[in-house]
């Protein structure tokens, strides 16, 4: 499925992420979250939930009859004058694109944002064949200009300041921008955008080939749909004489009615907009009478492991994804460790459930555990992908050894987990444990936080504080109101039992963390 075969070391990769990146990530995703909440509220919650259910139904039905829709799509594209190519895996997809480019003597390529191109590692193959590939998405263009000087975690360029981008443009493009490296205020975004636009327009006009993706493919008409905000995708698709479109087979939509539903959902959750700046419909190459569009259009339909998921309920529900990335924006894990930690082109919750199924659990067995199971991704997903259900399903397979990497679990961990389950399943023990923890935490308490616990918990609090343990809110409320509805306080014997349980759990947890620290657990 991919040239990558080494197991993904999520823990090791995330440990390398600089602390300042997390704050920048949260700030960037919070802005999108606020916009999303506003447009969804304006849509109306009841109507929104109905639209989500409709979107899910469209995606599930499409996947159940995917072969029929793809056959219809191929016939429609061919009838419109386009060429359809089928790629079983990443290697065959790269070969197809290289053969098309070489047959047309291509030396310069302009590329819009395409996760599929990254998935099949196409850019490196094109460069190895002597072709120049220019990223035209503004963020990707900045990252490409910076090259190896940019920390690998800063992808895309959302975490770079305006001043950093201005300095980069001065050095790489040789342009004069008002103000020096220490100028305050930094150059306006419009100034930087105009500089990039000037360079990119010249590249569009000189390019031999445009390389794009597509958000959807309408089977009944053979129409390719591209949803963007920058307009670079439209330029890549209309100015060069040759266009190659890379699309996973799962992005097909049966008809225009289904597309209308999905276009209602996608921009609202992806960018917090009712509709993006550009929605482009591509229907075959240009006719002789048209003044724009490619003279030749090639569509590469890529499987790369997706078809094997169709026979499994969890696989189909995963493939419902319409690639909005809303799950990334709300995920506390992604916002802390960034995308590079996931070790694959698709990070965040969707990467955590898709990579193990596409790449195999032997490669991505760590990713199902890269989640707090908070469920925020479930709530925000426009097509109601059940992330936590799929994550738990994949975790059970890893524990059962289906991926060839069953984790080594020490008896101490088993004992600690068993004791924790007993406490959490008993109201009496839980209340007693909470009261015990509230007392035991006193030496390390600073306000509402535990900022510096002793080993082995010191490893956790060295990175982030823990909230203090408090007794149940309802019990405290009734105590203040002198309400006896909760019954008599715990007996001394029960309190003693609860304290003992709490101490056993704490001891088990400490031993488990100690084992992990020594690399045993």
Residue ranges and their predicted role:
Residues 1-314:
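The feature marks the mature, well-folded catalytic cores of soluble enzymes
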Residues 92, 276-289, 323, 334-338, ...:
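A glycine-rich phosphate-binding loop feature that marks nucleotide/adenosyl-phosphate handling sites
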Residues 251, 319-323:
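Short, contiguous, pocket-lining structural segments
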Residues 275-278, 409-415, 448-453:
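Short coil/turn segments at secondary-structure boundaries
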Residues 289-318, 328-329, 333-446, 485-486:
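Ferredoxin-type iron-sulfur electron-transfer modules in oxidoreductases and energy-metabolism complexes
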Residues 419-423, 432, 490-517:
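Hydrophobic alpha-helical topogenic segments used for membrane insertion/localization
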Residues 437-500:
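Short linear elements at protein peripheries
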């Amino acid at each position: 499925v991919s040239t990558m075969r080494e197991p993904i070391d999520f823990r090791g990769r995330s440990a390398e992420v600089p602390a300042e990146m997390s704050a920048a990530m949260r700030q960037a995703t919070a802005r999108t979250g606020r916009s999303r909440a506003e447009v969804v509220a304006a849509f109306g919650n009841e109507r929104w939930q109905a639209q989500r259910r409709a979107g899910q139904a469209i995606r599930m039905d499409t996947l159940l009859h995917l072969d029929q829709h793809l056959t219809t799509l191929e016939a429609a594209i061919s009838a419109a004058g386009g060429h359809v190519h089928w790629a079983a895996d990443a290697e065959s997809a790269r070969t197809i694109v290289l053969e098309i480019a070489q047959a047309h003597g291509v030396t310069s390529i302009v590329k819009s944002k395409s996760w599929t191109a990254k998935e099949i590692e196409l850019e490196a193959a094109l460069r190895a064949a002597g072709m120049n590939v220019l990223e035209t998405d503004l963020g990707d263009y900045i990252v490409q200009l910076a090259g190896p000087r940019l920390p690998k975690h800063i992808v895309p360029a959302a975490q770079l300041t305006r001043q950093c981008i201005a300095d980069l443009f001065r050095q790489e493009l040789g342009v004069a921008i008002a103000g020096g490296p220490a100028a305050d205020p930094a150059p306006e975004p419009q100034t930087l955008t105009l500089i990039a636009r000037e360079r990119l327009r010249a590249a569009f006009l000189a390019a031999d080939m445009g390389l794009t993706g597509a958000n959807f493919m309408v089977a009944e008409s053979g129409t390719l749909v591209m949803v963007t905000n920058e307009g670079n995708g439209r330029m890549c698709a209309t100015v060069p004489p040759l266009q190659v479109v890379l699309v996973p087979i799962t992005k097909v939509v049966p008809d225009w009615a289904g597309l209308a539903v999905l276009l209602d959902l996608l921009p609202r959750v992806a960018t917090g907009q009712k509709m993006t700046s550009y929605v482009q419909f591509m229907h075959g190459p240009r006719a002789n009478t048209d003044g724009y569009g490619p003279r030749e259009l090639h569509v590469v339909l890529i499987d790369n492991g997706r078809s094997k998921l169709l026979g499994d309920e969890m696989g189909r529900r995963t493939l419902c994804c319409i690639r909005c990335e809303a799950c990334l924006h709300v995920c506390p894990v992604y916002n802390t460790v960034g995308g590079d930690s996931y070790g694959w082109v698709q990070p965040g919750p969707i990467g955590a459930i898709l990579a193990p199924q596409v790449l195999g659990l032997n490669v991505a067995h760590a990713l199902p555990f890269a989640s707090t199971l908070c469920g925020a991704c479930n709530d925000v997903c426009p097509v109601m992908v059940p992330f936590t259900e799929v994550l738990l399903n994949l975790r059970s397979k890893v524990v059962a050894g289906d991926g060839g990497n069953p984790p080594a679990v020490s008896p101490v961990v088993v004992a600690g987990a068993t004791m924790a389950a007993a406490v959490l399943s008993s109201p009496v023990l839980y209340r007693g444990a909470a009261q015990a923890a509230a007392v035991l935490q006193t030496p390390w308490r600073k306000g509402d936080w535990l900022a510096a616990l002793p080993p082995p918990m010191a490893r956790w609090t060295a990175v982030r504080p823990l909230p203090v343990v408090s007794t149940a809110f309802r019990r405290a409320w009734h105590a203040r109101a002198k309400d006896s509805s909760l019954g008599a306080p715990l007996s001394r014997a029960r309190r003693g039992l609860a304290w003992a349980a709490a101490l056993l759990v704490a001891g088990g947890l400490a031993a488990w963390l100690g084992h992990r620290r020594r690399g045993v657990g």
